[in-house]
């Protein structure tokens, strides 16, 4: 039975948007991610999934793997990607990510950067002005920015990436030519190792390889030099 308000039970997606979202433009939550590789640029689709109860109590469920933003990666390109550019996240989640990283610092260091959300906002502005996901690693860049803001030396090793909430870590969904998900998760390197046989098979299929060329393809599939940078579009 419905209440007097006929729309009471209807889902309103706007309720999921925080107060700051009104100030965002589409570039804050892009539909695609542009990744630089040694062979050129890859444009990868992004998928957004909202699973606020994922991983409650420390459980690593399938929902936890999907909570947040996930890059859609064709299996052929999996070994061309490097994890570092993806740590920057999309612009719309970067402030929350930087806040979480500041809160992950040991207490003796963290007390120099309070309130964390305000420091994170200033840090994000500096990161956007002076650094780029395409050329710079997030953690060392953030350490330098925090030192500039507060005059306190922060070693990159002081940040605890494992303490960052799962939804703030970029996810990856690896798909075959039929768009079937072959593997997914937050750890790109683990996926590359887990799917090395699938990578080899996809390369062989795409190139129509004979046995004489398999050795070269195996070396490519296992070597995966990795891309140098990327960013959300």
Region annotations inferred by a language model:
Residues 1-233:
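A positional "C-terminalness" feature that preferentially activates on distal terminal regions of long
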